[in-house]
């Protein structure tokens, strides 16, 4: 195991948002792991997973053992472990619960939200003492919290994934891509007898399209759009961008363009290339 992140802190302070970001960064994430299971489960998971993150909070039974658990983990995992504590002002937490219309998890123990927040602060005292990083989210929106965590955890961030999918419009649009680029306005190799049975990966098809007016310019245009988006995706802490390239049947033009883009982005990113409709 390379990295172990423990998220703890007040309900309404953003633990779910933080856990979601860590999942985007490639962590194996567990929400509200029972505290008595931490030292049992962790060795099993760490055998096959490099990056692990889980939430420990006041909902957990036997939370009074938090100091014992964290002390043991710090001894065992040392530099691999970071404990991040999320907090916020009472008024902010009250407003967030009102906005989401959710009940505070400790409200059943007391008779008001204010008392539930105070009780949770008391329960979390030991967890706060063992924390490596404390983030006050009172003045942070979810986007800003994501940026803060990316800044803190940048050194453990996984490589950005660019997923490129070629497809044929006649077989339906892909539903899981961020951008779709249409290449149907270029000549179709399907209507050239010697190229019909080949795919966009074939050298003769590639030569035909390379020599088609506007192809190189369009590749550069797509690249400019994708580069523009990539910078902003990375700044927001997102770790994946998906591109769909479509032609009529998904055999020639879309495959060629997808292969060209994959070749470009493999120099900087992890690339997953799929040709959905190639026969």
UniProtKB/Swiss-Prot annotation:
GO molecular function terms attached to this record: ATP binding; GTP binding
Keywords assigned by UniProt, alphabetized: ATP-binding, GTP-binding, Nucleotide-binding
Residues noted as binding GTP in the record, renumbered to the chain: 57-60
InterPro entries: P-loop_NTPase, RapZ-like, RapZ-like_N, RapZ_C
Keyword Glycoprotein: no
Keyword ATP-binding applies: yes
Signal peptide: none
Residues annotated for ATP binding in this entry: 9-16
SUPFAM superfamilies in alphabetical order: P-loop containing nucleoside triphosphate hydrolases (SSF52540)
Pfam families per the UniProt record, alphabetical: PapZ_C, RapZ-like_N
Family statement: Belongs to the RapZ-like family.
Record function comment: Displays ATPase and GTPase activities.
Name this protein carries in UniProt: Nucleotide-binding protein THA_1518
């Amino acid at each position: 195991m390379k990295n172990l992140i423990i998220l703890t802190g007040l309900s309404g302070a953003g633990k779910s948002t933080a856990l979601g970001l860590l999942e985007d960064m490639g962590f194996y994430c567990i929400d509200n792991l029972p505290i008595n299971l931490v030292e049992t489960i962790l060795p099993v998971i760490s055998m096959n997973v490099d990056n692990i993150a889980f939430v420990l909070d006041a909902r957990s039974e036997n939370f009074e053992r938090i100091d014992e658990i964290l002390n043991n983990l710090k001894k065992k995992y040392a530099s691999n472990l970071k404990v991040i504590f999320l907090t916020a002002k009472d008024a902010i937490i009250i407003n967030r619960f009102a906005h989401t219309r959710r009940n505070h998890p400790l409200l059943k123990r007391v008779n008001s939200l204010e008392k539930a927040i105070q009780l949770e602060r008391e329960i979390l005292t030991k967890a706060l003492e063992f924390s490596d990083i404390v983030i006050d989210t009172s003045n942070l929106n979810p986007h800003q919290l994501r940026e803060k965590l990316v800044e803190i955890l940048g050194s453990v961030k996984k490589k950005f994934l660019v997923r490129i999918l070629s497809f044929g419009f006649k077989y339906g649009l892909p539903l899981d891509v961020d951008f779709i680029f249409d290449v149907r306005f270029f000549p179709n190799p399907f209507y050239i007898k010697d190229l019909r049975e080949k795919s966009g990966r074939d050298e003769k098809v590639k030569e035909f399209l390379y020599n088609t007016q506007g192809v190189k310019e369009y590749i550069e245009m797509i690249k400019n759009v994708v580069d523009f988006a990539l910078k902003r995706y990375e700044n927001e802490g997102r770790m994946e961008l998906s591109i769909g390239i479509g032609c009529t049947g998904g055999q020639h033009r879309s495959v060629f363009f997808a292969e060209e883009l994959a070749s470009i982005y493999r120099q900087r990113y992890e690339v997953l290339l799929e040709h959905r409709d190639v026969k």
